[in-house]
Amino acid sequence: MTSQIQDLLATDQDLLLMQEGTMMRKVRTKSWKKLRYFRLQNDGMTVWHGSQPESMPKPTFSISDVERIRKGQDSELLRYLVEEFPLEQGFTVVFHGRRPNLDLVANSVEEAQIWMRGLQLLVDLVASMDHQEQMDQMLNEWFQQADRNQDGRMSFREAQRLLLLMNVEMDEEYAFSLFQEADVTQSDDLGSEEFVQFYKALTKRTEIEEIFEDFSSDKQKLTLLEFVDFLRKEQKEKDHAPDLALELIDRYEPSENGRLLHVLSKDGFLKYLCSKDGNIFNSDCLPIYQDMTQPLSHYYINSSHNTYLVGDQLCGQSSVEGYIRALKRGCRCVEVDTWDGPDGEPVVYHGHTLTSRILFKDVLATLAQYAFQSSDYPLILSLENHCTWEQQRTMAHHLTEILGEQLLRNTLEGLLVDSMPSPEQLRGKILVKGKKLRTIEVDKEEEEEEEEEELEKDEGPDLDPASPELDTQPQPETQGQAAGNKKERKKKVMKCPMSCLLICGHVMAQAPSSIPESILLSKQFLLLSSTTIMCPDLSALVVYLRTVPFCSFTHSKENYHIYDISSFSESKAKNLIKEAGNEFVQHNARQLCRVYPSGLRTDSSNFNPQEHWNVGCQMVAMNMQTAGSAMDICDGLFRQNGGSGYVLKPEFLRDTQSSFNPERPISLYKAQILVVQVISGQQLPKVDKTKETTVVDPLVKVELYGVPEDTKEQETSHVENNGINPYWGETFYFRLQVPELAMLRFVVKDYSRKSRNNFIGQYTLPWTCMKQGYRHVSLLSRDGTSLNPASIFVYTCMQEDLDMDEP
């Protein structure tokens, strides 16, 4: 373990008490609440539990798996049990990724505080570790696991077991020779320092040594000029290579003398390539680096579908935890489906299903607390309102009272309504997206023009089941006729629009007597396109994001405003992409749109968001509770720009006159060739950690997502029985027509002859954020959490103007 952890374990009173152990109640559901004995292990990195202090304990969690510790008051489950347990005695362990939270109740407030402080201290310590400290900690954990008799020494038999734990199968004779080399005391066992040498021998990076020696004249060090040459030729650093070389030597060269002489040793070279500076993801793309002052329609927006669900779409649980997790992932558009609930309180759930229900006001309280913890750019609340008039008034009250100043209630001062505000202008604000009684008004003249448009749309044919398909195209009318008919139109009795004809009687029947007749007969009231009566109080809270039905791109261009937004099912959007890709691009350059998963995805699976991003769809809503390649692509895109949830679209997707069509792309430049060499892997985890004797046979699949012409994949052969340092050395070529839209995904799998290859890890990033040269790819789990130190070592470069056949 690191010296810092050792010192804390010996001196910190909270950690000392945690090492002694505590009986606490583990809470899974309202009815499942059982006493368990929890204890922090001596390594300071693992918490074990058992039914009793003397029982055989089992590992519960590693500190590296924990994101944060929450107090009991913030636990949805513990709040339900407040009559059984004081909230002050409870706390929640929140894990990275999609792993369920662990709710615990201590026997006293003091005990709860001890565990909360102690765990958070260790979590913060792990988060602050650099790469070398993380490696030291991992080596300590491996040593502790292999040292079965806990004597602080490792025999060869224990070392053989360790090799299996480390995911490598090695010839016994060769393994014994490495063991003997490390056993400098010739005691037939290894101490902790000798074990480190044994590990280094096991994981010797010969492929990196070869690269080093290619640029080193004496094969021992890189001079400043040699390192600059490497950075320019291989890492494509170009003009700033000399300054960068000095900076990297100062940062990674372990020898003080080497730093003074401006030279880089083999160890320093390895440290550089294994650091964040040697990562494939360009660190320049990690903070906010894009222009955030453009209209909202110019950005991809990280969006969630049915955010309240943490399971499937039919019987899954609804929970405010769904909102917390989505917001934690940088989501900037969450969905809220509201229905009438008991006691006059609206509830949120997936209507007409067996999903559980949560209170609307609890959702808002969660948003108020977590909306801007991961990103301070605007949060969009996509409201699917199914409530009656009275409960809509309650919704409006809760929105204004609970969200307070966070809620955007008026247009921005000085901003004309013919221009959408930017993410920068809306920082710290929550916007309601939903239906609205009337459009945003600028002046009296524009209001009258809008009334004329609505009157023309209202004058549809009488309802007749046998009527032929209605012609939605406007009929030609001379200027004289238009002027002459204007007054006549205003005299006519207003009719329901086509979408409301079937439900007029129902609407009037369910309207509360408290609604004035003037409102019931108003145009704004009758313009609703559903059976729900729209309450003016709720309508007034929809400022910039008015939901409107989609008829056609021509209709939208001629009748809708820049603040109008339409939603499309994934199948509808795909058809429009194929039939009118360029019109879709122009539509999305002008106004926002939202794409949501098919209703047939009852298992909460996801579709590929890339094909919708290709036409500039801003809000591609994902089932964030479901892991898989689609969520990997989504997470990969929004990993950049500070994790703000907003990514600026390419310029050709922001131009309302753009000629771009992803189905038939014509690149402004000659197609480029992406070269990817998959070289080696490091410390790949086991697929099944319960099977100590199994070792993975890894292969790497390189996937490219973009316009249809650019979407393809290639994979390496598999390496047998080696998860610790497999070597592939295979090169692939990908032709890129539109690299600005490309997403690159590396997937490591365990080869199986009898069944599907098993997932080990993955990493996905945009082409625009890819660093060229020799780079490490840090692998993530299926849940998107770090598998550190697992990685693959690759070489990438772009070859322009290369005339070659498709590989």
From Swiss-Prot:
PROSITE patterns for the chain: C2, EF_HAND_2, PH_DOMAIN, PIPLC_X_DOMAIN, PIPLC_Y_DOMAIN
Topological type in the membrane: Peripheral membrane protein
A Pfam entry, by short name: PH
Annotated PH domain residues: 16-124
Any GO BP: phosphatidylinositol metabolic process
Region feature Disordered, mapped onto this chain: 442-490
Cofactor stoichiometry and binding remark: Binds 5 Ca(2+) ions per subunit. Two of the Ca(2+) ions are bound to the C2 domain.
Binding of Ca(2+) 5, residues: D750, Y751
Assembly mode: Interacts with GRIP1. Interacts (via GBA motif) with guanine nucleotide-binding protein G(i) alpha subunit GNAI3 (inactive GDP-bound form)l low-affinity interaction.
PANTHER family, alphabetized: 1-PHOSPHATIDYLINOSITOL 4,5-BISPHOSPHATE PHOSPHODIESTERASE DELTA-4, PHOSPHOINOSITIDE-SPECIFIC PHOSPHOLIPASE C FAMILY PROTEIN
Protein name (database record): 1-phosphatidylinositol 4,5-bisphosphate phosphodiesterase delta-4
Encoding gene per record: Plcd4
